């Protein structure tokens, strides 16, 4: 793997947020809010079949309804059982990268491990790069792109990008 293969996680032209929400108590709300607050310049596509609009943006019932030919990156924050079918949709749509924030995979035992193996198989067959599952996501302060569900304090833009498997590291960056 080279650094260029990670570019989609930091410099996408568009992002779909599966599990986006208008409910401030949901992680999917905070991901969209962070993208808006950080003034991400790419297109943001909230995906949730329960909504027509999310935080002022048109919402889509599924990834397949998004009018782009390809989607650079999808961040997934839905119950673990739904992730494999979303990954199949990502493969059909030509998604380049996926950040799976959802938990409940191999860290929970046999059933979770089976789910994770299914996700990995789909990703490998489709050539999709994956960060996660059970991750706090990515953050690029220079262009306002993030997939994290944690509150991102306002910061001066600069040449820093961050990818973390554990929230502790990203949280330490936030409070420093």
Where are these predicted regions, by residue range?
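NAD(P)-binding Rossmann-fold cofactor-contacting core
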Residues: 25, 34-54
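Glycine-rich adenosine-cofactor-binding loop
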Residues: 13-31, 161-166
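Rossmann-fold NAD(P) dinucleotide-binding segment
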Residues: 63-68, 81-103
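General beta-strand structural signal in soluble alpha/beta enzymes
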Residues: 45-47, 98-100, 124, 129-134, ...
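Rossmann-fold NAD(P)-binding glycine/threonine-rich loop
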Residues: 104-126
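N-terminal Rossmann-like NAD(P) cofactor-binding module of classical short-chain dehydrogenase/reductase
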Residues: 75
